[in-house]
Amino acid sequence: MAKKKRKSRKKQAKQLNIKYELNGLLCIAISIIAILQLGVVGQTFIYLFRFFAGEWFILCLLGLLVLGVSLFWKKKTPSLLTRRKAGLYCIIASILLLSHVQLFKNLTHKGSIESASVVRNTWELFLMDMNGSSASPDLGGGMIGALLFAASHFLFASTGSQIMAIVMILIGMILVTGRSLQETLKKWMSPIGRFIKEQWLAFIDDMKSFKSNMQSSKKTKAPSKKQKPARKKQQMEPEPPDEEGDYETVSPLIHSEPIISSFSDRNEEEESPVIEKRAEPVSKPLQDIQPETGDQETVSAPPMTFTELENKDYEMPSLDLLADPKHTGQQADKKNIYENARKLERTFQSFGVKAKVTQVHLGPAVTKYEVYPDVGVKVSKIVNLSDDLALALAAKDIRIEAPIPGKSAIGIEVPNAEVAMVSLKEVLESKLNDRPDAKLLIGLGRNISGEAVLAELNKMPHLLVAGATGSGKSVCVNGIITSILMRAKPHEVKMMMIDPKMVELNVYNGIPHLLAPVVTDPKKASQALKKVVNEMERRYELFSHTGTRNIEGYNDYIKRANNEEGAKQPELPYIVVIVDELADLMMVASSDVEDSITRLSQMARAAGIHLIIATQRPSVDVITGVIKANIPSRIAFSVSSQTDSRTILDMGGAEKLLGRGDMLFLPVGANKPVRVQGAFLSDDEVEKVVDHVITQQKAQYQEEMIPEETTETHSEVTDELYDEAVELIVGMQTASVSMLQRRFRIGYTRAARLIDAMEERGVVGPYEGSKPREVLLSKEKYDELSS
């Protein structure tokens, strides 16, 4: 049923894509024919658009062209009522209105108006243009401009219509830019003001030098008159304070209102960037690999267990497979920013703390207020006011970052009323992602300032992801895997996935990047990790034979050897080991799993093997000290207590996160974590990417890396009392350590070992607290086995 549903969904999506492409091509064809005025059809469309927009008909044609390209490329109907587009409509309507006002001024001046009706005169001008009775007349703003002018002339007269058009242009600019008119004027006027000030100061310096030259020339001409120049000098001396007066007006620490940087504004500036597809290198088709003969000295190491040559026909998944972001306006949060800033300052003042809010960052999930304390104010004094500040702002909880790294300020993070969703597509579309060589670059989300947060897994080199159930941990892991699939081909990155929960990573079964099918049996997981350890040791043997130190050096060595000798030796791929739930593995085989993870985390970085370990139980018996010491990069989602936060990050803070993707990211080498709103990725998006990857290349699992079924083997019991103890327990049909101690007069340790050996061989059941163990072997069965 699931396959049928997936096929029907694919068929519907394909039909919808064809429909969008046809409509887009039709719009593009109409606009190009009309712009070039090709034949009768082109002239007809010109008349049609001139009727509506007059002399500005080209704007309609360009809009139709953009609409056609959008339908053809994005395969969806664009939203026509966004804030920016509403501003654009205001500007265009104002231009049409101004054009029509100017048209009727000219007609009135010439005396060409026969009727007082604006619409009728415009219609007559259009008919003259259609009939060709005169050279194509000026139609102003067309019929739209005529209707606007008729309404505005009735309400405001001609001059008032022009004023209203200018006001509408200003409103449109505010809507398009998303900034207040005051901010825009400040941005434009500040460089002009600086230029004028510099020129004025330069003019004052020139005047001073000119006056000093004049004084020196007068002294040389009249040396006998000494008093008069002295008087003049006294009159000229009071001028330098003008310079000081200029500097007194500058007070950078005094702000009437805090500077606000909005997350939504940053998103609109980055809206619909042009993403160029990476050009694949053009090369000849692969030839059959012939066994190398002769004394070739490329690699005389152990044989390659798994590597594959590049599939030239493989195409990377496009970003169009991911859903576009749906941003909320966060209008309520924007309105409350100034009020909250004043509340913070009043609260500080009431507790005798001199501090001022100077900058505010409106992020996706939280708003960060930058507070600059006065000289002599202790940081701890502000940190201790955490509960009082939360009470003043009526916030669920606040987090204080004291101080902000690189700034002499304290950050107060307040949850937003509306949480803006961050999509993986917008994170991967950022400029930071424009690095095709970084195969392990992963997208995490956006920080409070709205900047995309990406990280290179090979520089981490291992990652721990922990958080409570439902906090966004699985979505984060899916986002990391999808980021790698969007950037790397199967011969460049391989993956080993371990999923004891059996439902999170099963969707990736069949992708060509997998070394083995997703491991869902916890007993096989330790064996899979041991196979990765063996691969790491094999790689180090390769490095020692070739005289290289890491995977980058080895691959460069292979490239040089292939270029010089014409060989086809494949390069080593990176390996990413993903463990979705560490707690289950630690319950089944803690010692084996911990040993393998410890060895990999200590040594695997240079071999190109990287670990991503996720767990929803961040306790010390799961995230042991040995594991944590070797995994320096951590991501903490919302947890229930400060103890769990300290287990993950070695510091508090994660207990104050909001959930739903709100995380603290602590990269290697950083002193403090960065708060990030995680990128959301739906199940449908994951399925689309996986389907695309599978259609490009089928999975070829490596037999050496598939964990096998292991039969349990029991060593012989060396204790001579074992047979007698089994006979006693089967006869009594009850088993306990104390009974063996009494009957055989032995110590507790020896008796407990006998019971453990019986449990391994299925003679007795498991430990059940104060109750005696259940005897699983009947007396009749024992007699049969012994006879």
Swiss-Prot record:
Keyword Transmembrane: yes
Pfam families found in the cross-reference section: FtsK_alpha, FtsK_gamma, FtsK_SpoIIIE
Basic residues bias: start-end ranges: 218-233
Keywords: ATP-binding, Cell cycle, Cell division, Cell membrane, Chromosome partition, DNA-binding, Membrane, Nucleotide-binding, Sporulation, Transmembrane, Transmembrane helix
Membrane topology designation: Multi-pass membrane protein
Effect of gene knockout: Cells lacking this gene show a chromosome translocation defect and aberrant compartmentalization of both sigma-F and sigma-E, and fail to complete membrane fusion at the end of engulfment.
Any one annotated GO CC term: plasma membrane
Recorded superkingdom: Bacteria
Biological process, per Gene Ontology: cell division; chromosome segregation; sporulation resulting in formation of a cellular spore
GO molecular function, one term: ATP hydrolysis activity
Subcellular location: Cell membrane
Effect of residue 473 to A: Abolishes ATP-binding and DNA translocation
Assembly notes: Homohexamer. Forms a ring that surrounds DNA. Assembles into complexes that could contain two hexamers.
UniProt similarity note: Belongs to the FtsK/SpoIIIE/SftA family.
Written domain comment of the UniProt record: Consists of an N-terminal domain, followed by a linker domain, and a C-terminal domain, which forms the translocation motor involved in chromosome segregation. The C-terminal domain can be further subdivided into alpha, beta and gamma subdomains. Specific interactions between the gamma subdomain and specific SpoIIIE recognition sequences (SRS) regulate the compartment-specific activation of a mother-cell SpoIIIE complex. Interactions with nonpermissive SRS in the forespore lead to inactivation of the complex.
Cited function: Plays an essential role during sporulation. Required for the translocation of the chromosomal DNA from mother cell into the forespore during polar septation, for the final steps of compartmentalization in the presence of trapped DNA, and for the final steps of engulfment. The N-terminus mediates localization to the division septum and is required for both septal membrane fusion and engulfment membrane fusion. May form DNA-conducting channels across the two lipid bilayers of the septum after cell division.
Protein name (Swiss-Prot/TrEMBL): DNA translocase SpoIIIE
Organism: Bacillus subtilis (strain 168)
Encoding gene per record: spoIIIE
